[in-house]
């Protein structure tokens, strides 16, 4: 399987001889932060060595930033990498996603032969996730993906609804995966994160440096 993630700007340049205006990836237009560029330059002398496979220093700093134990954090090559790793580790037989949503949830699920059920969001409800989504979660659904805010609709489910979805998942023996890669774009993002629900035990939260920090080429995400 040839997996393609992000806009294929190199293919466009090769075919048309110019760079595209790429609106496919939703990366911050502010570009790579200067501090990150300096850190990358400073780290170049160590590029002849393999990095720490457990990302100990990074996980420790992420733990301080997120307010969660470092033991609960797993780093990967972007959130997309972690989506596939999670699916390959759990090997769900049946999963539920909204439609429309980020396409790589279904791609990852189908790579292990999982049956993907789609809960179609209604145009007359402005493509919002409502409590009707809970009714689609039932025993036999092993995994649910919820994008917060949803890509591509931009809709955000209220935190009480996320908690309702999580408890429904717990009752059905289902793992809930909440993708918060775009959440930090919101000025009040701290009011909407599902981090406070991690104690429930059946929740995984995905985050990445790709979007907000303009670091798509660095490939860095965490769960």
Language-model regions, residue ranges each:
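N-terminal "arm"/small-domain region of PLP-dependent enzymes with the aminotransferase-like
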Residues: 1-49, 174
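Conserved beta-strand elements of the Class I
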Residues: 21, 74, 94-96
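Short glycine-rich anion-binding loops that position phosphate/pyrophosphate groups of nucleotides
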Residues: 26-29, 79-80, 102, 148-152, ...
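PLP-dependent aminotransferase class I/II
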Residues: 31-33, 54, 202-223
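Short loop-beta-helix segment that forms the pyridoxal 5′-phosphate
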Residues: 51, 63-85
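Active-site pre-lysine segment of PLP-dependent enzymes
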Residues: 110, 127-140, 152-176, 180-215
């Amino acid at each position: 399987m040839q997996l393609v993630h992000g806009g294929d700007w190199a293919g466009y340049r090769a075919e048309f001889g110019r760079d595209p205006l790429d609106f496919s990836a939703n990366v911050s237009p502010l570009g790579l932060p200067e501090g990150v560029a300096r850190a990358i330059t400073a780290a170049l002398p160590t590029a002849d060595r393999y990095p720490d496979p457990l990302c100990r220093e990074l996980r420790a700093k992420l733990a301080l930033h997120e307010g969660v134990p470092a033991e609960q954090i797993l780093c990967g090559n972007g959130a997309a990498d972690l989506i596939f790793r999670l699916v390959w580790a759990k090997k769900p037989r049946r999963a539920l996603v909204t439609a429309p949503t980020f396409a790589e949830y279904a791609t990852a699920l189908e790579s292990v032969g999982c049956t993907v059920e789609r809960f179609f969001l209604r145009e007359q409800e402005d493509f919002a996730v409502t409590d009707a989504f809970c009714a689609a979660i039932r025993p036999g659904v092993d995994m649910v993906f919820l994008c917060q805010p949803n890509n591509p609709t931009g809709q955000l489910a209220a935190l009480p609804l996320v908690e309702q979805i999580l408890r429904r998942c717990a009752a059905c023996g289902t793992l809930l995966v909440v993708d918060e890669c775009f959440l930090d774009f919101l000025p009040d993002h701290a009011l909407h994160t599902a981090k406070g629900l991690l104690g429930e035990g059946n929740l995984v939260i995905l985050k990445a440096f790709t979007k907000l920090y303009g670091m798509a080429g660095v490939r860095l995400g965490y769960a």
